[in-house]
Amino acid sequence: MTQQRNGTEAFAGIGRIRYEGPTTKNMLAFRHYDPEALVEGRPMRDHFRFAVSYWHAFRGTGSDPFGPATMVRPWETATDPLEAAIRRVDVAFEFLEKLGCDFYCFHDRDVAPEGATLAECNKNLDAVADALEKAQQRTGKKLLWGTANLFSHPRYVHGAATSPNAEVFAYAAAQVKKAIEVTHRLGGAGYVFWGGREGYQCLWNTDMKREIDHLARFMHMAVDHAKQIGFTGQFYFEPKPREPMKHQYDYDCATCINFLRTHGLEKHVKMNIETNHATLAGHEMQHELEYAGMQGFLGSIDANTGDTLVGWDTDQFPTNVYLTTQIMWSILKYGGLAPGGVNFDAKVRRESFEPVDLFH
């Protein structure tokens, strides 16, 4: 069992979560998911390829626009950001082991702190990648996909690949270059493009064609670099219609697939589809899966759900058995997701602040 460097467990008192069947009264047991049970000749673990999102599980604080952080995370004691990031790796892999989850996903800035310069950012990322690599070797856990955070830093206020500032475009390209290299080093099965700020707030001051052309050029550069370093993982494009921008260029599967074909990227990139993003686009998740599947672009999914009564991305854990059945029906219909998987892009609610709540 993974332990922190001081020899203690982050989730002491919680054992490995196991399948106990539908009649179990154990709240920390699987009732329906039996990893080794065969379905259509394949183990359930191979159908799902479950992954934990590093950003929600290990970086979420519970803060919102109306109040500060609520999450109790006893392991967050280091004052040095890099030391804290390296300690967090042990916590993450203990969680993966106890949950029985084979994969994880991350943005570069989830796992390593931002530095004052690009060189410092890369140095920090390399240091954490050392720890991630050792943890993977020790536990057998794998990286489903990596990506770069091109939306949080103020430099990306006008976008990254679509920024009107050439220096911002160049910085973003360098950041993606490094993120792909680290994903490759860690044996990642894929890499995701999600342009959180690749869009507009007002068309009066937006040259849409130019921005979309720049986005395509940016993605071609990433594909070319992947070939140069020998990265053979699958590239994914993740649709989302808005938030934080009024309109985003990766609106839905139809928009993204048209973009990929128009710009000669269709042989390199498939779709990473999120349920809550489909809701924001006015679609059911099954619609997005069917559209991508029939076009040959179904790649991976982010498993969550949204609240149809609110207009933003709530990233709730999926609890609707009819919705999840529809999703799996479409996935099986189109031959499964591998090398993609099912990433739990869902966060515990602000009121669920104890470490054990991560397992529930």
Which residues make up each language-model segment?
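Active-site acidic/histidine proton-transfer and metal-coordination neighborhood
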Residues: 3-5, 36-39, 87-95, 102-103, ...
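Short, histidine-centered active-site or binding-site loop motifs used for metal coordination
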Residues: 110, 197, 239-241, 305-307, ...
